[in-house]
Swiss-Prot record:
This is Isocitrate dehydrogenase kinase/phosphatase. One of its GO terms (molecular function) is phosphoprotein phosphatase activity. Keywords: ATP-binding, Cytoplasm, Glyoxylate bypass, Hydrolase, Kinase, Nucleotide-binding, Protein phosphatase, Serine/threonine-protein kinase, Transferase, Tricarboxylic acid cycle. One of its GO terms (biological process) is tricarboxylic acid cycle. Bifunctional enzyme which can phosphorylate or dephosphorylate isocitrate dehydrogenase (IDH) on a specific serine residue. This is a regulatory mechanism which enables bacteria to bypass the Krebs cycle via the glyoxylate shunt in response to the source of carbon. When bacteria are grown on glucose, IDH is fully active and unphosphorylated, but when grown on acetate or ethanol, the activity of IDH declines drastically concomitant with its phosphorylation. GO terms for cellular component: cytoplasm.
């Protein structure tokens, strides 16, 4: 058994690594304000990617330092880790980010030991943190009362959150915000003498936007509040909208968006605040939305094992067309799919396992523009065999035997990704009304365009590779063929040399590995002729190679597009 002093020193070194990670995380996040004020959009993209990769970098550094600092016979003695865990708990008890430090400890442990060594005695499978914290702390929100003057209250809010760059048209912004506030809330609310607006003290930054997040409440009711702010380069700051609809605010925090940059000294308190105004959001998703995606993964896992322990739910194959590269299963009562790489791919697929892993990891670091589902990667999941429907387990063992193994009463899944479950677009269209079909196809085209403008080409754009969220948004979720748009060679189909060319089974022109012919999209994407014609009327430019080349030129010139995670009331330039 490791001596108490040695256990305490190992725990201290683990926490020092966490402090180093948190400091670098804070510095990157803190720079978001200056990047917004200076309209440094490409720098913002680089900072976002750097912050995502920071966690694994710092875990690796800490692991190497531990291995260099301690005798391996002591450090790698798994029986000693309950004592190390106890020493660590004592160290993190006074912290404001204690729940994150538990996840950090877990990452270090998993970097030193195989998953066979995982237990609640050696790791924080279940949190030891109290639901209610007793820390004394500074207020995390600011409160405002209109006292009959809504415009004056809104002006005070905007002035309290002013930037080094002035507002472009403050009177116009105030008029717009007041109008939207009165239009979206019941008449009596704006006249209620108890009306209060509470705004989180830190501004949230993402891509080209900044957001004030809070709530509006009376004695009996509350509404979420989001005020998006834009920086029009050369013009100033614009308060673009005032949003109180829960579904719309929820979309701003969607699993399809990049992570916010926001200074949160007490993460649990901010997440609790978000949970109060967005009760439909899971804690895991909220932690991920503000950049703590590893802790989001911890919260997801805890929710999953709790669901399995307390329900009769059993794993089944996910609905939809079977994939050529991935196999997908799900729990009907748990809004998630589990994706495994098959042992053998369809012959028409030119990717390999390493390519697929690379593509899925790429999605984590790029701007998803609200059109790609976030993923979490897991290794060595263990589930009770009784939790699988026999048909599901049989199919998994058939198509992914190197990944799925039955060990007695347990099923070992060596590697998988989790994603939010959505309705596959092809299945959605089968049961949709005429209006729903039109709206879905319009959003499908917008999804492709917005991904392309963010330098992402989906590769396989078949309807089955897109899903429809509970808010009706179309989202791409099959990443094995994605690439950067600038890597693709878009071409027009050359005219046939002879009339017989058009009847031949093989093309009369050469095709390179990165060549894409948009004129071929209609027959590949739509078997339904009505849908094919409708999509052509909505997004016909997607069939033109010159459209794609124009996007490539804009990207190479360093242009960063505006993609708004909310409905804009009017177009304001």
């Amino acid at each position: 058994m490791v001596q108490h002093e040695l256990a305490a020193e190992i725990a201290r070194q683990i926490l020092l690594g966490f402090d180093d990670y948190r400091e670098h995380f804070r510095l990157i996040t803190e720079g978001a304000r200056a990047r917004f004020e200076q309209a440094q959009w490409q720098e913002a993209q680089r900072a976002s990617a750097a912050r995502i990769s920071l966690y694994e970098e710092k875990v690796g550094e800490t692991r190497r330092r531990l291995l260099a600092s301690f005798d391996h016979a002591d450090l790698l003695q798994v029986e000693a880790w309950p004592q190390i865990k106890s020493a660590y708990i004592e160290l993190i008890n006074p912290r404001f980010d204690d729940e994150l430090s538990e996840t950090w400890y877990n990452s270090i442990f998993c970097g030193l030991f195989s998953h066979d060594c995982i237990s609640d005695g050696t790791m924080f499978i279940h949190t030891t943190r109290p639901a209610v914290r007793a820390h004394e702390r500074l207020a995390q929100t600011r409160r405002y009362r209109p006292n009959g003057d809504l415009r004056g209250m809104l002006e005070q809010i905007l002035r309290d959150y002013a930037f080094s760059v002035p507002y472009c048209d403050l009177p116009g912004d105030l008029q717009r915000l007041q109008t939207q506030l009165c239009e979206t809330l019941p008449d009596w609310v704006c006249k209620d003498p108890e009306l209060t607006v509470e705004v989180f003290v830190s501004v949230l930054y993402r891509n080209k936007g900044a957001y004030l997040i809070g709530r509006i409440f009376t004695c009996d009711e509350q509404w979420p509040l989001a005020i998006p702010l834009l920086h029009r380069d050369g013009q100033g700051i614009v308060a673009d909208a005032l949003i109180t609809d829960e579904a719309e605010v929820s979309i701003i925090f969607s699993f399809t968006r990049s992570y916010f940059m926001v200074e949160v000294p007490i993460p649990a308190e901010f997440v609790g605040f978000l949970k109060r105004i967005l009760p439909g959001k899971h804690i895991a998703e909220l932690y991920s939305s503000i950049g703590f995606y590893k802790h989001g993964k911890s919260e997801f896992y805890r929710a999953l094992i709790d669901h399995l322990a307390n329900t009769d739910d059993r794993f089944v194959m996910a609905p939809g067309v079977r994939g050529m590269v991935m196999t997908v299963f799900t729990l009907p009562g748990f809004n998630t799919v589990f994706k495994l790489i098959k042992d053998r791919f369809s012959p028409i697929k030119s990717v390999n396992r390493a390519n697929v892993i690379e593509k899925y990891r790429l999605v984590k670091s790029v701007d998803r523009v609200g059109r790609m589902a976030d993923t979490q990667e897991f290794a060595d999941f263990r589930f009770p065999k009784a939790k699988f429907e026999p048909e599901c387990l049989a199919e998994l063992l058939e198509v992914a035997p190197s990944t799925v193994e039955v060990q007695g009463d347990t099923v070992l899944v060596r590697h998988c990704w989790t994603e939010r479950r959505m309705t596959p677009l092809n299945l959605y269209l089968e049961n949709a009304s005429e209006q729903q079909v039109r709206e879905a196809l319009e959003d499908y085209g917008l999804a492709i365009k917005q991904l392309a403008a963010a330098n992402i080409f989906p590769g396989d754009m078949l309807l089955k590779n897109f899903g429809v969220t509970r808010h009706g948004r179309v989202v791409f979720y099959d990443y094995d063929e994605i690439s950067f748009l600038t890597e693709v060679n878009f071409r027009h189909i050359p005219p046939p040399r002879y009339p017989e060319d058009e009847m031949a089974s093989e093309p009369w022109y050469s095709v390179g590995p990165n060549d894409v012919f948009p004129e071929e999209f209609p027959r590949f994407l739509f078997a339904d002729l009505g849908q094919r014609r409708l999509f052509a009327s909505l997004h016909g430019e997607l069939y033109d190679a010159d459209y794609w080349k124009g996007l490539q030129d804009a990207i190479r010139q360093g242009k960063v597009i505006d993609v708004f995670p909310y409905r804009r009331k009017a177009d304001r330039n």
